[in-house]
């Protein structure tokens, strides 16, 4: 019947519009990485987030929670895109501030490829992941699911400076370098891939 036909046509149009919308949304928000590369980025950045989060949790008191941004991927089209993450620190007073974002006309760096992590595939096509230790040496963490002891940071000047700035300009309160750390701080990891904002 005509009504049935009209319904089918309307549903078809709706389907096309919705899938087109989802496709466009993904194209605009999700980076275009092959599944293998996406897996490498997610594995590597999960370890980097653990490295950064553990350092903040173990070396700063006054931290309620550390929450990571998605993995922002920029400069697509090359074999390896640039990518970075930004941790947000919550203090005990309900304030939160994100590392790697502008503080009073100063631009601290984000945490990403080359500066903090090296991602690649070896000759056999296996994941090759290096993190930097406290002295800036590369530590191979390719086979690790959790941060190995030798990749733990004992000092991290970039993080320290960034947190000092955030406290100085009142974005965070009473987040202090302290070897007692914040043992009860929660760390929220995020391995979603997203298009970068730079």
Locations of regions flagged by a protein language model:
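Extracytoplasmic electrostatic interaction patches
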Residues: 103-198
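Homeobox/homeodomain signature
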Residues: 13, 18, 56-58, 137
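Short, mixed charged/polar active-site loops
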Residues: 96
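N-terminal export/targeting and maturation segments
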Residues: 22-93, 102-103
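N-terminal Sec-pathway targeting helices
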Residues: 1-17, 26
């Amino acid at each position: 019947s005509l009504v049935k036909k009209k319904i089918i046509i309307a549903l078809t149009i709706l389907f096309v519009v919705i899938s087109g919308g989802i496709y466009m949304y993904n194209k605009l928000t999700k980076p275009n990485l092959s599944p293998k590369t996406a897996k490498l980025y997610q594995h590597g950045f999960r370890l980097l987030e653990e490295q950064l989060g553990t350092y903040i949790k173990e070396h700063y008191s006054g931290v309620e929670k550390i929450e990571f941004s998605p993995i922002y991927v920029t400069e697509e089209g090359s074999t390896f895109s640039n990518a970075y993450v930004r941790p947000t620190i919550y203090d005990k007073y309900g304030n939160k501030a994100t590392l790697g974002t502008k503080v009073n006309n100063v631009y601290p760096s984000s945490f990403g490829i080359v500066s903090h992590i090296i991602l690649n595939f070896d000759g056999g096509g296996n994941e090759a992941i290096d993190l930097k230790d406290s002295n800036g040496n590369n530590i191979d963490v390719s086979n690790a699911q959790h941060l190995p002891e030798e990749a733990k940071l004992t000092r991290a000047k970039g993080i320290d400076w960034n947190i000092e700035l955030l406290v100085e300009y009142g974005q965070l309160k009473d987040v202090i370098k302290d070897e007692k750390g914040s043992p009860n701080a929660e760390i929220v990891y995020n391995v979603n891939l997203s298009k970068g904002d730079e």
